[in-house]
Amino acid sequence: MDSDDSFVKTAHVIETSTPENKKLSHRFKSVEIVPPSSSNDDPFGFSSTKGIRLSSINSNDLVNTLSKGFNETSNMSYNRILPSSPPTLEIGEIDYNEALQIRSADENQQSVPTVSIASPSTPELPPSSSPLLPPNGSESSSPIPLSLLSTSSLQQRKITPSNLSNTSKPMDSKQLERLIPVPHGHHLTRLRKKRRRDDDIDLSGLYETKSSSPPAIHSDEDPSYSDSIARSPVKSAFNLRKRRKGVKEKKILKTYHSQDKDTASDNDNNTGSSDEENDNLKELTPGKKEYLKSIKKYFQDVDDYQLHVVNEG
């Protein structure tokens, strides 16, 4: 303010010195020196500058036109700048350094937003006389009360099967099978297999190792053989019929070959006399005698037929 007082004193001296400078002194009377504003009332960083408002009686004077432009830039108001938004500056309206000061002052004035965790309503902050103290004893700069940080809303929610579906019922086995990951690719096996029903056939017997020895031949009259067939769970009706048929065929072929061998040996040893044949037939039962006669007749007819065909050919 010492420079301002000297400036006013010099203006007073010029006014009383010469009559030629009365016109200039008349202008200096209207000079108003505005003291610098405080930092609280100056959010845009004009505390380092001095606003000088010049007013002249003559409106057409050049000083008046310059003062209007200077007043427009120096006296920026809040009317065209919202308090929540940063100040909008036009090109050439303010210097770059002053713009940085405006930005820093605006950031300092913005209040720290209060975050609500427990409820959407804004929590009440404690008074400044009782600062918050964290567990370690140091002062806390956060305006959020520590009691709000240990709420039930911050706890992790437990995932239950009822939460996975819209209904409150627990998930059944089919729904749980959908959650099992199934690997893809020909070299990977499926983790989830089809659940076997109670009425399905037990196929474990198909994977048993079979012995190299042939199966023993049982007669149809043997009760143990029929019981073993009935108890086997893997045998189907087709396999049973096929097995029984094979057993019967083997029995017939066995008896046929044994009788055929006996007759062949008899024919080789005999001289062809009917007496020896009759003696052999006497040792046999009547049923076997008729059976052998029918076989001989059959083969004799076959031989005659072949010879007859050859003779005609």
Swiss-Prot record:
GO terms for biological process: mitotic sister chromatid cohesion; regulation of sister chromatid cohesion. Residues 249-264 have a biased composition (Basic and acidic residues). Residues 288-310 are annotated as: C-terminal Sororin domain. Residues 123-134 have a biased composition (Pro residues). It is found in: Nucleus. A motif (FGF motif) lies at residues 44-46. Its main location: nucleus. Disruption phenotype: During metaphase, cohesion defect between sister centromeres leading to a slight increase of split sister centromeres; this phenotype is attenuated when wpl1 is also disrupted. The keyword Cell division applies. GO terms for cellular component: nucleus. Residues 107-118, 155-170 have a biased composition (Polar residues). Residues 105-287 are annotated as: Disordered. Residues 184-196 have a biased composition (Basic residues). Residues 135-154 have a biased composition (Low complexity). The keyword Hydrolase does not apply. Pfam families: Sororin_C. Keywords: Cell cycle, Cell division, Mitosis, Nucleus. Regulator of sister chromatid cohesion in mitosis stabilizing cohesin complex association with chromatin. Antagonizes the action of wpl1 which stimulates cohesin dissociation from chromatin. Cohesion ensures that chromosome partitioning is accurate in dividing cells and may play an important role in DNA repair. Interacts with Pds5 and Psm3. Belongs to the sororin family. Named sororin after the Latin word 'soror', which means 'sister', because of its critical role in sister chromatid cohesion. This is Sororin-like protein 1. It comes from Schizosaccharomyces pombe (strain 972 / ATCC 24843) (Fission yeast). The lineage of its organism: Eukaryota, Fungi, Dikarya, Ascomycota, Taphrinomycotina.
